[in-house]
From Swiss-Prot:
Keywords: Cell inner membrane, Cell membrane, Membrane, Transmembrane, Transmembrane helix. The lineage of its organism: Bacteria, Pseudomonadati, Pseudomonadota, Betaproteobacteria, Burkholderiales. It is found in: Cell inner membrane. One of its GO terms (cellular component) is plasma membrane. Its main location: membrane. This is UPF0761 membrane protein mma_2179. The chain crosses the membrane at residues 45-65, 103-123, 142-162, 177-197, 208-228, 252-272. The keyword Nucleotide-binding does not apply. It is a multi-pass membrane protein. It comes from Janthinobacterium sp. (strain Marseille).
């Protein structure tokens, strides 16, 4: 039975939905994301004032955006923070950022460095979740995040200004039916959060993320954010323990806990977004075993060999390799890098920028591969030595193993694939054994 939340989302079976959350929970543990959320919380507290200072400078420089600033402050109070501490925290941050505008040039540089350090840490964490090996150039990363810091407040302020006009236009309707008003306002809050999360999941990782996956992860994160915000606000109001213990500064530890929960939700949504294509297309249950790299490498070479032997093109993109072998992008990249070092394959990169076509599936054409080695001379033993066992030294036992490998795997890849062509080529239809 297929599950389709909205027609343009991925269609998943109930079994795949269960697998998705099981795999996402495993990734959360493997990547130690609760601890990472703690590190991001500390970095956020340090960088929040510099980022707000930059935003305040933009609003001050352009008086036209003063309305946006008011809307942004209202969004911060009503949507981003639980009631009870929002006004207090906003007052402190506004006071700190106003004083920061009077800093010297050296102090301003220090603020900018702090903000950039936070952006780079977020970039590292997101690429770690997507298992990205190749990072963007440092200048490109700084420019991307600088654009987010400068344009983000304006876009949020503009959207909130539009939303306030919408609230005013529908005020009579929502006041007449309180339940409708509550649902309407909550839906708008979730929608704005979903757009923010979705944009984050698409822009930050140095990998093409299909927008359907980002929307699903963004929607789940936005719903979780709204639920946790309401529960946290109820806890702060009903259980005033922090106020009794900390007194006037009680808002600060509560704010730290809230920032931590916000980052935990953000990272969990990122894990779900990254896990969706893996559960849908790849063997998420696979645990590497001794010798499995040899089998996986042969599956990749089989696809490249078939493309080389075809009359069309010998070039194969990584998406086709994934579809034909069920190997993840990170798995296939590691294997292909070894083949690249051995001189068996070549990597071709597109000159154009990354692009995403809305309403269509993306094709990851940035990394394309072609088989260079002559399969008539490359043997199974060569592949085995690269991915499983290489004698290296002159030890007697190693030499015996080397001789056994040569005798048992002397066949050339071309002969092996020709014999296999009577059935399916390795990697064309791999057996799928899910747990």
């Amino acid at each position: 039975m297929k599950l389709a939340i909205v027609p343009f989302f991925r269609e998943l079976t109930w079994s795949q939905v269960r697998n998705l959350f099981h795999f996402a929970a495993r990734r959360l543990t493997e990547e130690r994301l609760p601890q990472v959320a703690g590190s991001l919380t500390f970095t956020t507290v340090l960088a929040l004032v510099p980022i707000l200072t930059i935003a305040l400078a933009i609003f001050t420089t352009f008086p036209l955006f003063n309305t946006f600033r008011t809307s942004l402050e209202a969004y911060f109070v009503h949507n981003l923070m639980p009631k009870g501490i929002a006004n207090t925290i906003l007052g402190y941050l506004t006071q700190f950022s106003s004083k920061a505008t009077r800093l010297s040039a050296f102090g301003a540089v220090a603020l900018i460095v702090t903000a950039v350090a936070m952006m780079l840490m977020i970039d590292r964490v997101f690429n770690q979740i997507w298992r990205v090996k190749t990072k963007r150039p440092i200048v490109q990363r700084i420019l991307v995040y600088w654009a987010i810091v400068t344009l983000g407040p304006l876009l949020i302020g503009a959207s909130m200004t539009f939303t306030s006009y919408l609230f005013t236009a529908t005020d009579g309707v929502v006041r007449g039916v309180p339940f409708v008003g509550a649902v309407f306002y909550t839906s708008i809050s979730i929608l704005l959060s979903m757009v923010a999360f979705t944009s984050l999941y698409i822009v930050v990782p140095n990998r093409l993320v299909e927008w359907r996956d980002a929307v699903v992860g963004g929607l789940l994160a936005a719903i979780a954010f709204e639920i946790v915000k309401r529960l946290f606000a109820a806890f702060v109001i009903k259980v005033p323990t922090y106020t009794v213990v900390y007194g006037a500064v009680a808002a600060f530890p509560i704010f730290l806990v809230w920032v931590y929960l916000g980052w935990l939700i953000t990272l969990a949504g990122a894990v779900v977004t990254a896990a969706l294509p893996i559960v849908k297309y790849e063997r998420w249950w696979h645990v590497p075993q001794p010798g499995s790299a040899f089998v996986d490498a042969m599956a990749l070479i089989a696809v490249l060999y078939e493309a080389r032997a075809s009359a069309d093109s010998a070039v194969v993109d990584t998406k086709l390799l994934r579809d034909r072998t069920q190997l993840g992008f990170d798995e296939s990249e590691a294997l292909l890098e070894k083949m690249l070092d051995a001189g068996w394959v070549a990597r071709l990169k597109s000159e154009g920028p990354k692009r995403m076509q809305w309403g269509k599936r993306i094709t990851d054409g940035l990394d394309r591969w072609v088989l260079l080695a002559n399969p008539e001379y490359l043997t199974l033993a060569d592949v085995y030595r690269v991915f499983v066992f290489d004698a290296g030294g002159n030890e007697m036992l190693a030499k015996k193993v080397e001789c056994a490998v040569e005798q048992g795997l002397y066949q050339s890849l071309a002969n092996y694939f020709r014999e296999s062509s009577e059935g399916d080529l390795p990697g064309q239809h791999l057996p799928v054994h899910q747990p």
